Amino acid sequence: MLKTTIIGASGYTGAELALMVEKHPELTLAGLYVSANSTDAGKCISQLHGKLAGVIEMPVLPLTDPLGVAQDSDVIFLATAHEVSHDLAPLFLQQGCQVFDLSGAFRVKGDDFYTQFYGFAHQHSEWLDKAAYGLAEWNEEAIKASQLVAVAGCYTTAAQLAIKPLLISQLVDTNQWPVINATSGVSGAGRKASMTNSFCEVSLQPYGIFNHRHQPEIVHHLGCDVIFTPHLGNFKRGILATITMKLQDGVTKEQVAHAFAQAYDRKPAVRLKGDVIPRIQDVEFTPFCDLGWRVQGQHIIVISAIDNLLKGASSQAMQCLNIHYGFSPLTALL
């Protein structure tokens, strides 16, 4: 059994991970931790997340001795802020732990990227270079080999799973940039209360126009420019992305369908719906990405639906763990 520790366990993604670890036949939950100054420190996780009552009755402890935690852990999940993951990941890695980081701290190679888009100077370029990008369906070999897996972002997962098959098959005319309009539930902003996310204030609206940090992450890993506009939806969880692309001259519906089928053959976390339009309702509380599409003339619209807390975060992290250790990819996820 792999001794597994979750740092940042009080948040939504941390709680989802705790439940997955508890269900996993090859993992044992070694500890749940939050930052030393967190108001959640010392509370039972079932007190913070009622759905875990009777399932996990373990205290969420303040992280005051990271080296001690590392010595008692085989696997570390970091469900922490970007800067916190940046500082903690190298410490755990140096102690021999396998690390799955759900933040953006190691997703994009290039130190100046973090200064520009995350507001801090990256100090660990050696680990940045070694990190595997955790887009599970598209990076299995690197995930198997790397001690550090930087789990892909939520919007970036929904977008890339929809675009990559067509891009790899050279069916897209990239002279016209793919246009991604994606709407996320309020849980994407985390558990901390804010006026914008409060019940009476939350409203469907775009945000981060031209400057959302997932845009350069998408561009970096796709290898082509995109226009990305995220939206805040007045619902709890899920992402629905609607992506418009121009196809190369002469591309047929059959070629499009073949590209998706070829890309996701034996990839059980991606469900191809064809001309059936995906819905958040069908993917929330699941580890799946549903993809549907329609072709008209030279244009295609692809719809991608995921649960932002699961396929967009925790279940993808666990999927990466399963890939790394050679377990069935959806172990503990269904």
Swiss-Prot record:
Its EC number is 1.2.1.38. GO terms for biological process: L-arginine biosynthetic process. It is an enzyme of class 1 (oxidoreductase). It catalyses: N-acetyl-L-glutamate 5-semialdehyde + phosphate + NADP(+) = N-acetyl-L-glutamyl 5-phosphate + NADPH + H(+). Keywords: Amino-acid biosynthesis, Arginine biosynthesis, Cytoplasm, NADP, Oxidoreductase. CDD domains: AGPR_1_C (cd23934), AGPR_1_N (cd17895). Pfam families: Semialdhyde_dh (PF01118), Semialdhyde_dhC_1 (PF22698). Pathway: Amino-acid biosynthesis; L-arginine biosynthesis; N(2)-acetyl-L-ornithine from L-glutamate: step 3/4. Gene3D superfamilies: Dihydrodipicolinate Reductase, domain 2 (3.30.360.10), NAD(P)-binding Rossmann-like Domain (3.40.50.720). The active site is at C154. It comes from the Bacteria. It is found in: Cytoplasm. One of its GO terms (cellular component) is cytoplasm. GO terms for molecular function: N-acetyl-gamma-glutamyl-phosphate reductase activity; NAD binding; NADP+ binding. Signal peptide: none annotated. Belongs to the NAGSA dehydrogenase family. Type 1 subfamily. Catalyzes the NADPH-dependent reduction of N-acetyl-5-glutamyl phosphate to yield N-acetyl-L-glutamate 5-semialdehyde. This is N-acetyl-gamma-glutamyl-phosphate reductase. It comes from Vibrio vulnificus (strain CMCP6). The gene is argC.
